[in-house]
Amino acid sequence: MSQGGGLNILSIQSSVAYGHVGNSAAVFPLQRLGIEVWAVNTVHFSNHTGYGEWRGPVLAAGDVSEVLRGIGERGVLGSCGAVLSGYMGDVSLGEVILGAVGRVRGANPQALFCCDPVMGDEGRGFFVRPGIPRFMRERAVPAADVVTPNQFELEYLAGVEVRTLGGALAAAEKVLGLGPGTVLVTSLRRRDAGEEGRIEMLAATREGAWLVGTPLLPLEVNGAGDATAALFLGHLLLGRGLEEALSLTASSVYAVLEKTLRRGAREIQLVAAQESLVAPPVRFPVRRVA
């Protein structure tokens, strides 16, 4: 995976003052990896919406566009190695993000676009506005180099149910057929895993697929997927191979979640577990599955 023109990532996501989701979950892990982050916030909430109550503004697509325009006017887009996107409030914001990706690629053709296609999850279904799922499948994912769906999002993008490893591989192949070069399934639970109490990540390219599993912790938190996408992209930008990036990402995220569980915290403990972002204490092995 090419490093592009520099260790700088343009991250266009939501932001919260309290807790860790969106940019508030992505920026710090990337910085701990030694990567500069140009964070452009799409909302600025008091806390994430999982609490049921929150305050703060949603930025209009035009305001986000102005911030991105200002960054471009600094003449630095040629040193941007990647663009990272997450939750998109509406289709107009999605168009702004794709416009920014186009300008970055115009300045640095080797820049990566990592799209975390946030749409929903198992049990909750879709939680985004109408039009976003279709925009993700027809516009954002085809434009991306890397996509990081959870299992629910993988099923939607591929148009198939995923219950086995073979099903997951077939679904990942369908998503690769939409355009991206790498698919990271951030949370895979399958009937044929052979062991209860585990959760897996699956990384697939046109050359093969790799799987890593970790213990499934009794924990319900927000932001782990945002941190996962950021770490995986960061390791790729640093020039690490897919297998190493997968192992490091899964191992770091597990360490963060384990720390969160031990502390009985509602928010992922990125700061308390920050050494694990760089050097996870336990490295989970990766095996090739295709």
UniProtKB/Swiss-Prot annotation:
**Gene3D superfamilies linked to this entry:** 3.40.1190.20
Enzyme class comes to transferase
Which annotated residues bind substrate? 14, 226
- Cofactor(s) recorded in Swiss-Prot or TrEMBL: Mg(2+)
Q: Which InterPro entries match?
A: PM/HMP-P_kinase-1, PyrdxlKinase, Pyridoxal_kinase_PdxY, Ribokinase-like
Q: Which NCBIfam families match?
A: PRK05756.1, pyridox_kin
Role of this protein: Pyridoxal kinase involved in the salvage pathway of pyridoxal 5'-phosphate (PLP). Catalyzes the phosphorylation of pyridoxal to PLP.
Q: Which residues are ATP-binding?
A: 116, 153
Could you tell me the EC number(s) of this protein?
A: 2.7.1.35
Q: Which domain of life is it from?
A: Bacteria
User: What is the protein's given name?
Assistant: Pyridoxal kinase PdxY
